[in-house]
């Protein structure tokens, strides 16, 4: 798992973001949904920057129409609590 922390400093405010690799388990309710239909951005406030396929192939900046499959790993960027919440849904 990527445990990179990115600190973005804006006027008097510091925002700590986490980038992590989240595995899609066999029972995840996200399987078969497109990224758009999964509403990850709206429900979790996260950005999916890439998808790592079982084969190891990386899809950077996946399209909204990308369909999530079992075995995929979503590379998510956002606040730690939000990443943790999505991780639970990914596992199913």
Regions found by a protein language model. Name each.
Residues 1-19, 23:
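Anionic-ligand-binding alpha/beta catalytic cores of soluble enzymes and soluble regulatory domains
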Residues 21, 25-92:
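Cytosolic Rossmann-like ligand/nucleotide-binding regulatory domains
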């Amino acid at each position: 798992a990527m445990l990179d922390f990115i600190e973005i400093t804006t006027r008097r405010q510091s925002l700590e973001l986490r980038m992590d690799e989240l595995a899609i388990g066999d029972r995840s309710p996200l399987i078969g949904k497109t990224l758009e239909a999964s509403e990850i951005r709206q429900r979790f406030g996260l950005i999916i920057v890439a998808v790592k396929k079982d084969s190891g192939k990386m899809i950077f900046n996946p399209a909204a129409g990308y369909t999530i499959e079992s075995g995929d790993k979503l590379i998510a960027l956002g606040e730690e609590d939000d990443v943790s919440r999505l991780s639970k849904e990914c596992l199913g």
